[in-house]
Design a protein with these regions (language model features):
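Active-site catalytic pocket residues across diverse enzymes, especially alpha/beta-hydrolases
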Residues: 20, 100, 127
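Charge-rich, low-complexity N-terminal segments
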Residues: 85, 108-112
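Alpha-helix N-cap/loop-to-helix initiation residues
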Residues: 2, 115-116
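C-terminal helical cap(s) of enzyme catalytic domains, especially alpha/beta-barrels
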Residues: 116-128
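Acidic/histidine-rich catalytic cores of soluble enzymes
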Residues: 1-80
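Conserved beta-strand positions in the central sheet of alpha/beta enzyme cores
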Residues: 65, 107-108
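A short, acidic, amphipathic alpha-helical segment used as a generic capping/interface helix at domain edges
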Residues: 47-55, 84-101
């Protein structure tokens, strides 16, 4: 999500993984805000999941850092927001948490601690 860096999109990360000795043992942590800032349109969930699957494979996602985005889509800026209070929005997070539950992928919140409890409750509500 920071722009001109290696691994800014998942196809670059897939290329790195495929060059290690045991690529089957390597997975990724997918950050919702970083990916949104890098051009992954979480508000268009189905197409984004298809894009991720085509670039790296959904099975490579081992963990999700759940953060909304203070910045616009494809901004190339790393600015986290609390769930539902940013540009990704609650509808997209409803799809993301349901996907994580279906695939048994853990999620970690990285926003300030004062509101983490509220974020957790919102994610549980969106999931169910």
């Amino acid at each position: 999500g920071a722009g001109k860096i290696i691994g800014d999109d998942l196809s670059e990360i897939a290329e790195i993984i495929n060059k290690v000795n045991h690529p089957a043992l390597v997975g990724i942590c997918l950050d919702t805000q970083h990916s949104f800032a890098s051009g992954y349109a979480w508000r268009d969930f189905e197409n984004t999941i298809k894009k991720i699957d085509a670039e790296i494979g959904l099975e490579k996602i081992k963990l999700i850092h759940a953060n909304d985005s203070l910045t616009e889509f494809n901004s190339k800026k790393d600015r986290h927001a609390h769930i539902g209070q940013g540009q990704i929005g609650p509808e997209a997070f409803q799809n993301i948490v349901k996907f994580a539950k279906e695939k048994n992928i853990d999620m970690i919140l990285e926003t300030e601690h004062e509101k983490v409890k509220e974020d957790i409750e919102l994610l549980k509500k969106l999931r169910d």
